[in-house]
Amino acid sequence: MSASSPQTILAFDCATSIGAVAAVTGGDVRWTARAAALMDLIDDVVDDPRRIDAIVVGTGPGSFTSIRIALATARGLALALDVPVAGASTLTAFSGGEPVIDAKRGEVFSEGGISRPEELDVAGKLLVGDGALRYRAVFEAAGATVASDPDLHRPNPHLLAQHAGPFGSVEDVDPLYLRQPDAKPSA
């Protein structure tokens, strides 16, 4: 983020099975992992919503519905508070290894896109994320190590804020959908 970036940033990501929310003010970060509804988590880290200067939202890849909920929440808050929004890939919210996110249907999201776990070249790599946990046996059989620290498997919204794109209108933040939603419109 540049020197002209806002001072108090609400950052959140809901794209994985382990969502997270943070209020970033200077070097101080207050964050929590998913334990309740998104707005409850936001209430946990933000004392006064009027102090939010900007919002950073995880854009995926991940659950189609969860990404839509996160973007709708960012939009509602941005409009109500009249603050700018930036997006960042959920994959940037992990540290300590290569992120692998559970894509359901026997697939994972990674830097390479969407694939079956056994198709990833993971030999000698340290993996993090809910996909790494779900497919631990597959990845370890392929020569990877799945991080033992549970904190490495949840997105860190502080990292998300560090990798955010330019701040602007929420309409300029695009979701990163790598496949169509599971739900289909009825005929």
Residue ranges with predicted function:
Residues 1-26, 30, 36, 40, ...:
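Oxyanion-binding and handling regions
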Residues 9-11, 52-58, 66, 97-100:
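Short glycine-aspartate micro-motif
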Residues 31-35, 53, 67-70, 154:
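Alpha-helical context
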Residues 36, 40-43, 71-75, 79, ...:
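N-terminal, well-ordered alpha-helical segments
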Residues 42-54, 121-123:
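Phosphate/pyrophosphate-binding loops at sites that engage ATP/ADP/AMP, CoA/4′-phosphopantetheine
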Residues 47-50, 78-88:
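Phosphate-handling active-site elements
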Residues 54-83:
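DPxDG-like acidic metal-binding loop motif
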